[in-house]
A protein has these predicted regions:
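An acidic/histidine-cluster motif and surrounding catalytic segment
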Residues: 1-119, 128-164
């Protein structure tokens, strides 16, 4: 798929079928740039998804340059960021979560944990944005939900806490 007429299109096509956990209503496709692996990320995110997370989502782990270009095009910010979320208008498809691989590596080093842990932190944060939460405007609601899910998923720190 390609970007066209100002509408977002996923940066890469999923190569494997979506992972849907036995008790989850969320199917997660994970696609990563060549040379990068994200084992278990889809199953982990699906297992933690809030009840209202129904349908499918794609998590794409791409280059910093790709994220910078997407951030500039869709948010008018010519900077690389760690994670972007692109909600879908299709009721069966929540949207896309795009993670900058280089930023994730650097943040993992700074936080003292693995890249896989950082990918989980970023994917969870992106999923909550796809569900409509906005930590800049919701008086801590997203932070509380993220903290609860993070704890359930074995993560000690989330993205919102880091930036406070």
């Amino acid at each position: 798929m390609r970007e066209s007429a100002g509408r977002y299109r996923p940066p890469v096509r999923p190569r494997q079928p979506a992972v849907r956990r036995k008790h989850s209503r969320l199917a997660v496709d994970v696609v990563a740039s060549p040379g990068l692996r994200a084992p278990g990320l889809g199953a982990w995110l699906s297992s933690l998804a809030p009840v209202r997370a129904r349908g499918a989502v794609t998590v794409a782990v791409v280059s910093d340059a790709r994220v910078r270009a997407l951030n500039h095009r869709y948010r008018r910010k010519p900077l690389v960021t760690d994670v972007l979320s692109f909600p879908s208008e299709d009721p069966g498809y929540l949207g896309d979560i795009v993670i900058a691989a280089g930023v994730a590596r650097r943040q993992a080093r700074q936080a003292g944990h693995s890249l896989q842990t950082e990918l989980r932190v970023l994917a969870l944060h992106g999923l909550l944005h796809l569900l409509g939460y906005d930590h800049e405007r919701d008086n801590g609601r997203m932070a509380r939900i993220e903290a609860r899910l993070r704890s359930r998923g074995g993560l000690r720190e989330g993205l919102i806490e880091r930036h406070r």
